């Protein structure tokens, strides 16, 4: 994440400001964010206990595959930041905002959520913990709900978004949803 911070400081300080906002107004989004905080604690703290007490025996090959998935997800995250200067943490439509159809947005409508799902479900395995992997799967419906909620706002308030949904059929997972 330090790389993305340096990238944003140099390339797009306005996007960095958008990514650090926390003034979400929608109740459902506040609940999703609160659940995400609990999730992050589980995913990053539980593997330490798992290692300490030897609860999981994740094979090295699986750790390496998970590391590669985390790396690919991080690259996708950077590509999203590069393509979309309006990628705010808060669900909103800003003045002058346009629909982005290039880069990862040509494949799915919410590539940042896809990158987070890949990164955060692979991280427990990369850290050698089956016990943290299981609860990490809860992130998938959380981010799917966030994407669906975000789409309601974008369809209503962002010019051209409805046409974009007709061209780019998948929200999160190419070929699936």
What do these predicted regions represent?
Residues 1-102, 114-177:
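Membrane-anchoring alpha-helices and their flanking helix-loop junctions
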Residues 108-109:
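Conserved SAM-binding loop
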Residues 105:
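Short pre-catalytic strand/loop immediately N-terminal to key active-site residues, enriched for Gly-Thr
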